[in-house]
């Protein structure tokens, strides 16, 4: 847990068998100024989190504006929610100006990646696979770019690739999408894209 810290490195840990989030960074809701910046979360193996006991959690959870914070090279899987919210990587309220790259997240009971709301995050070169409710979710459409999503691999099993209020203000480019059953891809609920 790194609440109001900066220049912290959380690396090379095996984190498992917890009822809530594996790594938490930041603790300011919304877009207010935060003491959290330039943190690095890397090379962690995070798994068996939640056990269907708690909700609103992630293998890696962030909160608030965090310029320079980097989440990379983490392996996150088997995240199990009680009622809602079991994600591999979860930038929650106001999480902004972060780089999320080269992570693998799979077998989550919600989507693998969820951004509640935030500004100008870069999400690239990740693999998100077999989320129970799809691959990627965002909660709020905002006037600014919420996140840039590029060069990622999304693997689904008859689930939507993206879920959210609508396409939102996202930049998506150069991603690879695949359904393990060879079915037509569900880009978003109620819409099919071949």
What are the roles of these predicted feature ranges?
Residues 1-194:
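Glycine- and acidic/polar-rich repeat regions and solenoidal domains
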